[in-house]
From Swiss-Prot:
PROSITE patterns: DEHYDROQUINASE_II (PS01029)
UniProt xrefs under CDD domains: DHQase_II
Site (described: Transition state stabilizer): R19
Protein name stated in the entry: Catabolic 3-dehydroquinase
């Protein structure tokens, strides 16, 4: 049986590599996705889907589609929606697909409004502050889940 993993990136993550490189580094989202596909390709029984959107409703739609596709694990960096979106939280809960929340920076070292996540209490794990390596760690976990 093929393990299907969905990697979702939210608003402004399409700007990685150029957006505040002192915080987020110079690695682009395309680089992250390419590395993720290479990592998953080492496992013959795994498939990776990647998705990025700046619009909350489209992210919710993609989470709901994941259930229909038989996705068994979601890795999500919801970006700013982490701190505001009950809708994304409800979509994740509604599909009952296990997920890991990933953040490139340590959100707890940043502005106070970034300290609260609508996702973390329901996530299997939260990875924050490891830079883009957080995606690698999350994928490794998902593949062995």
């Amino acid at each position: 049986m093929v393990k299907k993993v969905l990697l979702i990136n939210g608003p402004n993550l399409n700007l990685l590599g150029t957006r505040e490189p002192e915080k987020y580094g110079t690695t682009t989202l395309k680089d992250i996705e390419m590395e993720a596909h290479q990592q998953v390709a080492k496992h013959q029984d795994a498939e990776l889907f990647t998705y990025q959107n700046n619009t909350e409703g489209f992210i919710i739609d993609r989470i709901q589609e994941a259930k229909q596709q038989g996705v068994g694990f979601i890795i999500i960096n919801a970006g700013a929606y982490t701190h505001t979106s009950v809708g994304i939280r409800d979509a994740l809960l509604g599909t009952a697909i296990p997920f890991i929340e990933v953040h490139i920076t340590n959100v707890h070292q940043r502005e106070p409004f970034r300290h609260h996540s609508y996702l973390s209490d329901k996530a299997i794990a939260v990875i924050a502050g490891l830079g883009v390596y957080g995606y690698t760690a999350a994928i490794e976990y998902a593949l062995n889940y």
